Amino acid sequence: MSFRKVVRQSKFRHVFGQPVKNDQCYEDIRVSRVTWDSTFCAVNPKFLAVIVEASGGGAFLVLPLSKTGRIDKAYPTVCGHTGPVLDIDWCPHNDEVIASGSEDCTVMVWQIPENGLTSPLTEPVVVLEGHTKRVGIIAWHPTARNVLLSAGCDNVVLIWNVGTAEELYRLDSLHPDLIYNVSWNRNGSLFCSACKDKSVRIIDPRQGTLVAEREKAHEGARPMRAIFLADGKVFTTGFSRMSERQLALWDPENLEEPMALQELDSSNGALLPFYDPDTSVVYVCGKGDSSIRYFEITEEPPYIHFLNTFTSKEPQRGMGSMPKRGLEVSKCEIARFYKLHERKCEPIVMTVPRKSDLFQDDLYPDTAGPEAALEAEEWVSGRDADPILISLREAYVPSKQRDLKISRRNVLSDSRPAMAPGSSRLGAPASTTAAADATPSGSLARAGEAGKLEEVMQELRALRALVKEQGERICRLEEQLGRMENGDA
């Protein structure tokens, strides 16, 4: 008798999410209420940026990661736009540079002081003007320095050289309707887009040509999104004709049928996908949801494997994702999200439980670093390059929690009652007599300390034996499960 495979082996099967304590959240932030399906949040290893409500224009907060707790209403903002800010994105090659797109039809690039803002920042480093309607999408090139993509409600995609404020490419005939999102591939030679006409397009920006197109990737009328994966596949989220939320995986070489298609639920919030190329895990966050679902993408069918769901009580207004080089590798942290509530930002840590305190090579392969692989001029000339990788081993800090320290009192230094006059032995110095009198009590104290130490050691040995017994039991159960899956039992 054969059994259907119930459990797929995966090192990410036990990933769990944990919100941080309240004192590590960012409180009293007036998150933007603008109706736009943006993340409203961007984060890097130094700063957290959140689009906020602002009177008389658009603004966003930039906070050092360490500035947790209540944020004063008078805290300075980045406030140079004359209309609401719709999207923000940190430069992957400079942690102090951020770009913003706004309803005022402009893109602005800002230089944040190394230690954060001490006064409102109103003067951008660069203003990029080329759109005729509001700019809702900002995306830096992953490997070329100073190359920035913007897309607006004029259905135009512009690619800029920020260093010279020059418009490099204008793609104004490839999208007949509103663009929902864009995503670069790993080396920045192509990007994919999701459009209101229900099509997913793969575009070569330097040639200005359509490489591939899939009409009605999702048949529902609600917003959809598309992202490139590291292997060149395209992952999409959207809605079915019956308004059920869907996930799909596509091969750009053949967009006729999806490699995989899954239906999630019938909620109406747009699904925002966040992809980790190092682990091939996609985290899906629905706007207005109170959960984060995560899936592992593999090369074997069914390709999209559900892992787990993190659930909380409050719905999310937006979400930011920390780059891999900003995680705490010594705590086996594989992702960290910054969830926007109505009035605060709450970090959520995703962790893989591991027994060992050693650096986990399988969880942390070399990842994209902050160094650009190309200059803008090289990319324009036709060159492509993968991201320059760095090791996270240097960020690993060994845990010291397992060190057993026994603190022993110096019993000879204890204060003692004064001896009665004449109680010393005849001819013996008082200090000698005191030391002699202290010797029996000192021995008793040391014996008591030794007894406590022995109790601790016995308890430690008992715990080790229990852990070993449970480990053996788990191994037996896994073997039994394996035999059942293979039809041997």
Curated annotation (Swiss-Prot):
Residues 427-443 have a biased composition (Low complexity). Keywords: Actin-binding, Coiled coil, Cytoplasm, Cytoskeleton, Phosphoprotein, Repeat, WD repeat. Residues 449-474 form a coiled coil. This is Coronin-1B. Residues 414-443 are annotated as: Disordered. The keyword Phosphoprotein applies. One of its GO terms (biological process) is actin filament organization. Belongs to the WD repeat coronin family. It is found in: Cytoplasm, Cytoskeleton; Cytoplasm, Cytoskeleton, Stress fiber. Forms homooligomers, but does not form complexes with the other coronins. Interacts with Arp2/3 complex components, including ACTR2, ARPC1B and ARPC2. Binds actin. PROSITE patterns: WD_REPEATS_1, WD_REPEATS_2, WD_REPEATS_REGION. The keyword Iron-sulfur does not apply. Phosphorylation on Ser-2 regulates the interaction with the Arp2/3 complex and cell motility in fibroblasts. Phosphorylation does not seem to affect subcellular location. GO terms for cellular component: cytoplasm; stress fiber. Its main location: cytoplasm. The modification Phosphoserine is found at S2. WD repeats lie at residues 80-120, 130-170, 174-213, 217-260, 265-305. It comes from the Eukaryota. GO terms for molecular function: actin filament binding. The gene is CORO1B. Regulates leading edge dynamics and cell motility in fibroblasts. May be involved in cytokinesis and signal transduction.
